[in-house]
Amino acid sequence: MLSKIKKHLYIWVVGIITISLFLAFKFGILSLGTRFQRDNSVNIEITEIKATQNLDEQVKLYTKLIERVGPEQAQIGLLESGLPFTGQTHLLNHTVGDYLYQKYGPAGLLQCQDYFLSSCYHGFILHAIADGGMQKVAEAFGYCRKEGPAVFSQCAHAIGHGFLANAGYKNLIQALQTCDQAVNTMSEFPAFNCYDGVFMENIWAVHDGKPSPDRWVKTNDTQYPCNDKRIDDKYILACWSNQPSLAYQFFQGDIKKVASSVCAKVKKLEYQQMCFDGLARQIHPLTQGQSSKTLELCSLMPSQQWNNFCVSVNAGASYAVGDRDAPFQICANISPEGKNECYGRIFSYMKAYQKGAEDIKSLCAKVSELDWRKKCEN
């Protein structure tokens, strides 16, 4: 089974992936554009990459760039290149994950960035699975764990992608059970993030340029596979985390229809909330970091309750990907009944995502509302 990854390492995703993961998503890195523009040396291979549609040739050029300027600058160069956020670009960026694994082994994972929907992580983890199965994955996750929850949760998500690609798309349940094996093998391994990665991979499941016929998707059933009785209840929450992305495809980007025809009709409250959470994260990359756009798109939710929830999720998503301005602007403009949830989410993220040089007090100063600023400082 592992040999399948070696054969398909460069062809397993060729469709656009639009979720928010967490993720889609780094508006905070837009400031790096100037640095890229100044670095004309990066333009050499990037220009050639953009001039061809042949993936094999693009991989050769990208590898050359990685070797010349280093993995970090190469990833920035590709991100700022203007290449579309399509499956082919996602797949191309797997190259840096392959490179890092081959050169540094499991320790190389920490040099991955989450650009192009964490494709460096995906390429790296797939390579680890092909190289040594669960043992190598565990070694890589050990390095992730040292970096804290914000990093190791993302690694677990990438591992979930790899488990399904390795098992084969018809073996969705097997991949989910492999996540359970990982929980028993690796300390602090977050099961939900792995399940989430499995279900996200099931949505895209692309081989040779078209969705695999083996993926668990029914175009006439927007609740499938979350309503499939073969899937254990403990996995269903992660299924609903991704279902809005699938429905968004089915309804050709009609956010209001996804909200009213899919999420609003989910009967169990826990699953319904996760559906709206997934839809809010689907909205996040569409906002382009603009608080006004967030408020506009979230107004498409079917009630004020879900409107506020959508706004709060987007504020948190913006903070998680590095934006230190928009989240505070978003919470300042949410309706009064939504402020507690919005600011509460941001304040908890400030602690969870605190970086060495960040000063909480200076971040609190960005809260424009005095009462909430005091709560932030306390």
Model-derived features: where do they sit?
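N-terminal Sec-pathway targeting helices
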Residues: 2-18
